[in-house]
UniProtKB/Swiss-Prot annotation:
CDD domains: Arna_FMT_C, Arna_like_SDR_e. Homohexamer, formed by a dimer of trimers. It comes from Salmonella enteritidis PT4 (strain P125109). Residues 1-304 are annotated as: Formyltransferase ArnAFT. The gene is arnA. The record marks 102 as: Transition state stabilizer. Residues 314-660 are annotated as: Dehydrogenase ArnADH. This is Bifunctional polymyxin resistance protein ArnA.
Amino acid sequence: MKAVIFAYHDMGCQGVQAVLDAGYEIAAIFTHADNPAENTFFGSVSRLAAELGIPVYAPDNVNHPIWVDRIAELAPDIIFSFYYRNLLSEEILHLAPAGAFNLHGSLLPAYRGRAPLNWVLVNGESETGVTLHRMVKRADAGEIVASQRVAIAQDDVALTLHHKLCQAARQLLNSILPTMKCGDIPSVPQRESDATYYGRRRPEDGLIDWHKPVSTVHNLVRAVAAPWPGAFSYNGSQKFTIWSSRICPDAQGALPGSVISVSPLRVACADGALEIITGQAGDGITVQGSQLAQTLGLVAGARLNRPPATSGKRRIRVLILGVNGFIGNHLTERLLNEENYEVYGMDIGSNAISRFLLHPRFHFVEGDISIHSEWIEYHVKKCDVVLPLVAIATPIEYTRNPLRVFELDFEENLRIIRYCVKYRKRVVFPSTSEVYGMCTDASFDEDKSNLIVGPVNKPRWIYSVSKQLLDRVIWAYGEKEGLRFTLFRPFNWMGPRLDSLNAARIGSSRAITQLILNLVEGTPIKLIDGGQQKRCFTDIRDGIEALFRIIVNDGDRCDGKIINIGNPDNEASIQELATLLLDSFDKHPLRCHFPPFAGFQVVESRSYYGKGYQDVAHRKPSIDNARRCLGWEPSIAMRDTVEETLDFFLRSVDVAERAS
């Protein structure tokens, strides 16, 4: 059987040798040229191929039609990929009659994506493995041929685990390749519900947050220990790297980041202390912890810090229009937690962002985007990333004020998009899950699902089509005029500071705020058309983390992309949401300050929203794009979100109002 192999790294060498030992003919090997900036501690596939007398190539783009044709001329029966770093096109995958197969460094479907070796250590896993699977268009998603488990010892670091995985891979290939050569190829579909995705790790991801649990910090040290770039921190302006550590349970009440002792060198974390066994100051040599403390001039009680702001590198300027809104104020908080971001914002109010007004990297102007066009144009020109978050996004307004919805959501935002085109600025635009309308797909795919809305005489759809039309305009500007953009589609984000109870009193709020108002005032909870409509509720913290990663745009992977941001696992009907909320309300310590529960009341949507309303039975996102582009996965359970949101609103009610 003739094989074409795509391979790199130690795993690539193991794979090539295993294929030869199994009696395959290798027509050619495709690999990568080594990057001079990378620590190439691993074996060379190109050198191995040359020594074996096998043709070897390292094209910049193996998916180019010229290379696809050359591979086709080789007429492979089967294709193998062993740690080749680029995805292969469907044209290449279809060239081999027996199929194309990839060796992945985890027990799929867990830890799809990049750097699974490091991520399993970061997350403190006790087991991983290697998996041979059939290659399909989606990375790491094809049917499983074979897998082998690998136990992770508590003293394993990245390099020792790497060696274990290489050994396991060789054992796996030695057992399965002869069987495959005879045409017997097992195939077990992956369980998508168990799939997790992780993105590429960068050297800067090794920055230690001393406010994390000590186990988290220790696992980070293990995950990026030499020959990887290492976990690091700062003493003043001096960077130092920790190469090995151990956990000490007692932090002696010290604040996170405080040096507890210098011999041994121990630093307080959130719930314990990290003992630094070996480390390195700057570009110096590796020394034991106590000598590192001496080199850095550390004394007991000193505080380690985050990296100093780099004077030679300008901070990234982010313009947020609608900064006082639900997404805007939470995003501002996330950005200001990072030293290299500066936030410029405008909104008609400042109640939700009052906590930032004195922050030196937050610049706010109170104003209306429909009036202050000169200020907006100037700041679009001045900033690096623009987020036009201003919109009317409450369903009752779609039928009550459809023209105002169109004027603000489409016309005013179109002007801002044109400024971004004019000054060649990147825009991160909030599309909406509403654009999918009455789509019948089980889960809504950004690139494939049809966008289906009702008839013109149903003004309820004016928000959806305004957003959809702007999505299409932005896409066209990207195609024709080079606008850098990302469209993100939130699916029912919830959390503190979502709307207000006053907005709920006039019916202009999202569902959970309205339900909380009913509980606070002792009025019946209204279930529109019985409350059987299903939504996927997403915690604001999960949503903001995904949005932050879009702004970071690692490797420009978000450019020109549409990304759903939602939690498919948190699907519930409005009735189920109300029941969960009521249960949390009854258990809340402030429950005694509010009236008795007034029951549920089923009402027709027309009587509640008015003429021209249509509802949607379900709305579940596919989040494959978010997993692939962001390395993001939602993690917060719906009950936690409901309890935190309820607590925020109950504590915001005035004491006098509670008593009444």
